[in-house]
Amino acid sequence: MKLLMLCREPRLYSCQRLKEAAKRQGHEMDILDPNRCLLKLSQNPPHFQIFYQENSGSKPYLLPDYDAVLPRFGTTSTQMGCSVLQHFEGKGTFCLNLSQAFLNARDKWKSLQLLLKTGVPVPNSFLSGGEVQAQATIPHISSPTILKMLNGSQGIGVILAEKPQSAVSIMEAFKQTNISMLQQDFIEEAGNADIRCFVIGDQVVATMQRIGQDGEFRANCHRGGKTEKIILSDDEKQIAIRATKAIGLDVAGVDLIRSKNGLLVLEVNASPGLEMIEKTSGVDIAAEIIDYIEINAFINLR
């Protein structure tokens, strides 16, 4: 098969692992930056064409047909990346995570709405409109509370406010820069630990527990946390699978937290990193992803 990965940083561990796994299984893989794509819509066939400019001085060339597309772009490329994905969808190409599902996952508030709508447990959460005074949110939030930027990643834009007035001050400051923030109950009993599940299709293929540094409430590895192996029950795995389906994804990193009221879903990531979870779990996730593409791209072609 001829595969395409949409990614701005081809040297990243995850991109290299996926390319190696594809090559090992006899496939070609191109890695291209979605921000260098030119999309063309035509009334007459071919209706969907995609051109690519290698650099600022080169002439854009027409991309060939691909058997499958893997989106691995970051939050700064979401809009263009999803436009490119949608173009491939228009061409009938199999995409590992559709554009709408990708957009769902990148919107933290919409994700929570979709999860709760389908019965997936999430922390109590709160979002106020731009004309609502921050002070008016105090009766509706717990203390301490977590504040999150709607499009943050890797723990960036996540703040712990110990007191209600601190939360108000933070919200007022961000409001000045037109940045909306959602508020969530702080799950104190979980300490500084959470769980990452890697879901492919109908299976949880790998898990790990993430533990934040001393004095750090965020468990993200990018914030200096450590990881450990963890075994989940079948019921806990089902929550991660249901969360993935609620967002509409084929492949996802689902972040879970254990609370006194049971397991809760914190977030569903459409482009989860492979490095820490492969090294912690010992699972060759890259090969599992290529296996999944082989099966589903073939079904898509029939």
Swiss-Prot record:
One of its GO terms (biological process) is protein modification process. Mg(2+) 2 binds at E267, N269. Gene3D superfamilies: 3.40.50.20, ATP-grasp fold, A domain, ATP-grasp fold, B domain. The gene is rimK. InterPro entries: ATP-grasp, ATP-grasp_RimK-type, ATP_grasp_subdomain_1, RimK, Rimk_N, Rp_bS6_RimK/Lys_biosynth_LsyX. It comes from Haemophilus influenzae (strain 86-028NP). Mg(2+) 1 binds at D255, E267. Its cofactor is Mg(2+); Mn(2+). Residues 112-294 form the ATP-grasp domain. It comes from the Bacteria. Binds 2 magnesium or manganese ions per subunit. Mn(2+) 2 binds at E267, N269. Mn(2+) 1 binds at D255, E267. Disulfide bonds: none annotated. ATP binds at K148, D185, F186, D194, R218, A219, N220. Belongs to the RimK family. Keywords: ATP-binding, Ligase, Magnesium, Manganese, Metal-binding, Nucleotide-binding, Protein biosynthesis. This is Probable alpha-L-glutamate ligase. The keyword Ligase applies.
